[in-house]
């Protein structure tokens, strides 16, 4: 799960809670960035509210900044951000991103690139109910005719605005409901 660690927008927090609840309802384990703030904390709280298992992965430099999720069933503290991302990739069966900022984008792009290059075949899903990423998606789409981005790379990322559809896509069920 990639999501914001700073904003406190009510609609973002509500979305994160719904995603966490839905993950738990499916009996899945939530693997997230290990913070207890913003959407990151809300998704974990949502999962736990339905009896879900949560795994938080946080670099020691962020333990105090993002207030480590000490309620996680398993809290893994890494030395670096790179180690955090590797542990999250290793422990995840799919990648789901919610609205976020540069940290969310960095994690999303790394997983996206690795999948496009064949380093993993895990589903990669962007849950974007309010059009947070529309500008980014338009820009990326504009790069296809120039050759900077392959259409196949864009097709590797499934985009939806619905929580259940996002989880179905994570499970390999369904199709991308937004065309690039």
Segments (PLM) and residue ranges:
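Glycine-rich beta-alpha loop segments
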Residues: 1-53
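Short, acidic/small-residue loops that bind anionic groups at enzyme active sites
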Residues: 58, 98, 105, 112-138, ...
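Glycine-rich, small/polar surface segments that engage phosphate groups of diverse ligands
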Residues: 32-81
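Active-site/ligand-binding-proximal alpha/beta "capping" segment
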Residues: 83-118, 125, 174-180
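A charged, well-structured terminal subsegment
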Residues: 90, 94, 145-180
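Cofactor-binding loop segments of dinucleotide-utilizing enzymes, especially the Rossmann-like FAD-
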Residues: 4, 35, 59, 100, ...
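Glycine-rich, charge-decorated loop segments at or immediately adjacent to ligand/cofactor-binding or catalytic sites
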Residues: 38-45, 132-141
